[in-house]
Amino acid sequence: MPTFNQLVRNGRKPPRWKTSSPALESCPQKRGVCTRVYTSTPKKPNSALRKVARVRLTNGIEVTTYIPGVGHNLQEHSIVLIRGGRVKDLPGVRYHVIRGALDTAGVANRKQSRSKYGAKRPKS
C-alpha cells in the first residue's frame, strides 16, 4: 500500500490493455504480400491440415494468417487483405485472410454464410 506522499508524487496508473492483434496497429484490416503458403497441424485433440500463409504487411511486420474455407488460390507473392481473429487450435495464428478481397478468390459453390467467404449469390 503506497503512502499518501507516494501517491502525490506518482499517482495511480490506469491499467494498459493489450491488443490481441498488434500487427494491425488499430486498423480494421491490413494489406500484405504472401511470403509462404503452407499447411499446419492443430493442437492435441484435433487433427487436420490447416491452410496458413506467412504474410508481410505494408507496415513491415510479418505474421502468420489462417486461410478459411474449402480450397484457395493463394501462392507466394499474392496480395491479401487480413483481419484480426485467432485460430484456437493453431498456436501463433492470430489473423485471418479475408476471402474475396484483392488476390484472394471467394469459396466456390458456397450457399450459406456467403459473406464470410466472399462468395457471390448463386443464380437461382
UniProtKB/Swiss-Prot annotation:
SUPFAM superfamilies: Nucleic acid-binding proteins
The protein, known as: Small ribosomal subunit protein uS12
BP GO annotations: translation
GO molecular function: rRNA binding; structural constituent of ribosome; tRNA binding
Region (Disordered): 1-25, 104-124
Domain of life: Bacteria
Modified residues (3-methylthioaspartic acid): D89
InterPro entries: NA-bd_OB-fold, Ribosomal_uS12, Ribosomal_uS12_bac
Keyword Ribosomal protein listed: yes
Assembly notes: Part of the 30S ribosomal subunit. Contacts proteins S8 and S17. May interact with IF1 in the 30S initiation complex.
Family: Belongs to the universal ribosomal protein uS12 family.
Key words of the record: Methylation, Ribonucleoprotein, Ribosomal protein, RNA-binding, rRNA-binding, tRNA-binding
Key word Ribosomal protein present: yes
Annotated Gene Ontology cellular component terms: small ribosomal subunit
Biased composition (Basic residues): 111-124
Entry function: With S4 and S5 plays an important role in translational accuracy. Interacts with and stabilizes bases of the 16S rRNA that are involved in tRNA selection in the A site and with the mRNA backbone. Located at the interface of the 30S and 50S subunits, it traverses the body of the 30S subunit contacting proteins on the other side and probably holding the rRNA structure together. The combined cluster of proteins S8, S12 and S17 appears to hold together the shoulder and platform of the 30S subunit.
Organism: Solibacter usitatus (strain Ellin6076)
